[in-house]
Each structure stands twice: as structure tokens, then as C-alpha cells.
Amino acid sequence: MRSGWNEVRSIAEEQWGLVTKRQIEKTGIAWSTVSRQVGIGGLERVAHGVYRLRGGAEPEHLALRAAWLQLAPEAAVWERRPEQGVVSHRSAAHLYGIGHLAADSHEFTLPRRKQTRREDVWLHRGDVGDCWVQLRGLPVTKPSRIAADLLAGHEDPG
């Protein structure tokens, strides 16, 4: 099982120390082993189905990163496409430091309808096309798109 944990560590190294339940399951590690690691402090549950390997520094924007990983829990960061979710609206503005809007929820835009049970996650339906960039390791809408999204939602981006 050591090779399974090596694979989990390798995935987590590329994902800010985070790994999803589905990614762990792909390695063949038994869920009882994962539960034991949570119990002894080797893993920390940061969101439903998202865990952080202990020992490293906590990544900035941890909750946002965990929410983004939940959108496509089987896919590693390097395998993801914009169709699987792009940080947008207030969350994107917060990452850029634009405006004074509270980023008290995590907002993402996806081309297809998707639902979440999380009350702090808002999923917007739309096609971002090429109006996104990588920012701090996350796909994030460009400032011009942020302004358009916020104005369409009757928010003052200023």
C-alpha cells in the first residue's frame, strides 16, 4: 500500500497539498485506512470529499480551492479543462483584488447546469470561452469578464 500513498502524495504535491476522495480511491487505498489517517492527523478533511495532507503549510484560499476540486473530484488539477469550472464573479474579483465586494461564497462558471448542496457555493451557467487565465494555480475569469458578470448580476464591481 506504500505505492498508493506515494501516488496520493504525488497528486497532493501538485494540488496545494489537497486530494479528493475519488483520487484516493483510484490508488486502491482502503477507505478504512483513509479514516484512520484522518483520526491520527495525517489527513485533514477540509470539505466533503476533499482532504489536506498534514505537514505542509496551509495553502491560501483553501476553501475556494477545495470547492473547485469538488466540481470534478476525479480529475487532477493538471487534467482539468475550463468546462469543469472557472472561478468567476466575486470570487474572481477577490483573487485579483478588484473592488470591495465580499467574497463570502465561492462562485464558478460552467457551460452546463450543475448542482451543489453547498450553501456557500454558487454555480453560474455560461461559456467563458477564452476569457479566463490561470491565476494562483486556478482557472479564473479575466477582469473584463468579471466586470461583465457582476454588472449582469446588478452588482457594482467598483
Stretches found by the model and what they are:
Residues 1-158:
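Short gly/ser-rich loop at a beta-strand->alpha-helix junction or flexible surface loop bordering the NTP-binding
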